Amino acid sequence: MTSKPGSQKKLTPIVTLYALLAQIHRLDFSSRSGPASRNAWSGQGSGEVTVSREAAAFPHDGARQAAQQEAESVVFLEQGQFQLEGQSSSVNFHNRYRWQLAADGKALSLSHERRGRDAAVFLFDLVADSARGEDHFVSREAHLCIDDLYAATLVIVRDEAGNALGFDLDWRITGPRKDEHLAYRYRC
């Protein structure tokens, strides 16, 4: 993959991932509560992803805001069905996530906008995990939300010919009442 026709310059892994976001249309996920969890959130879900591009949201972090002021964001509007283990019926879910490429092209920020754009919650910056390969990414640092730590890994999934099919995003949430693993499978 090159940055423009005729160019031999290869896109950075994080820019490649950012370009893939616009192609996502479907998600499947599972949540597993570990032994220290007090939430009992184990279950399965699936749904559709509507992707849009918007002017960048400005998180309340001044340094981040200045660095990303001119950026555009990719927004995932997710909706579908989730079924808790042991339950006979499912419930509707919907989420709104904002993906934003850092001005230096070295990180991809993820924010959750469950309560709207003005109440966005920054989750983490994903950076390339070069030790594992160019399709592997990891949260730069765990995000602290009250007493809970959120961390993630992301892997681009490819077919035998090397074409991107989507990506797997695995979350780990730990804290005094949480011991959760979320496995999201986003596909084109």
Question: For each of these PLM feature ranges, what is it?
Answer:
Residues 2-187:
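Soluble ligand-binding/transfer domains with enclosed cavities or grooves
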